[in-house]
Amino acid sequence: MVKGVAVLSSSEGVSGTIYFTQEGDGPTTVTGNVSGLKPGPHGFHVHALGDTTNGCLSTGPHFNPAGKEHGAPDDEVRHAGDLGNVTVGEDGTAAFTIVDKQIPLTGPHSIIGRAVVVHADPDDLGKGGHELSKTTGNTGGRVACGINGLQG
């Protein structure tokens, strides 16, 4: 089993820990807890870079090795890093589990060393009709991020 972990931080008081596990060539399971967010859905993505030298802004676009348009996690056409939304409760926290086949922890398209980003607004899953729907899901600013590092 391969495991990764990302510790989220931000200048806006958002924090959290995201765990990744993958057994063999199976799907990757993502479990996380995030706090300090406004209630409601927030876009949640793996970004292409593990660079936080300029905060979350330097993490690059969504991880997209196949060069596809943005979409929902269950869509055939989507960025590999498109993980949809995490839903935050009235207390400002979210606990979630996501199982996904497009974010391996090994091989040429591994997400180890890449950033995980929580956005300010909901991901419209590429279906919102906004000019940014097919690239970012119109998710607004990047409110927290962390680098997915290999875990022992």
UniProtKB/Swiss-Prot annotation:
CDD domains reported in the protein's UniProt record: Cu-Zn_Superoxide_Dismutase (cd00305)
InterPro entries for the chain: SOD-like_Cu/Zn_dom_sf, SOD_Cu/Zn_/chaperone, SOD_Cu/Zn_BS, SOD_Cu_Zn_dom
Residues the record lists as binding Zn(2+): H62, H70, H79, D82
Pfam family, one: Sod_Cu
Reaction it catalyzes: 2 superoxide + 2 H(+) = H2O2 + O2
CC terms in the record's Gene Ontology section: cytoplasm
Name listed for the protein in its UniProt record: Superoxide dismutase [Cu-Zn]
Keyword Metal-binding listed: yes
Keyword Zinc listed: yes
Molecular function per GO: copper ion binding; superoxide dismutase activity
PANTHER family linked: SUPEROXIDE DISMUTASE CU-ZN -RELATED
Annotated EC: 1.15.1.1
Localization (cell): Cytoplasm
Cofactor remark from the record: Binds 1 copper ion per subunit. Binds 1 zinc ion per subunit.
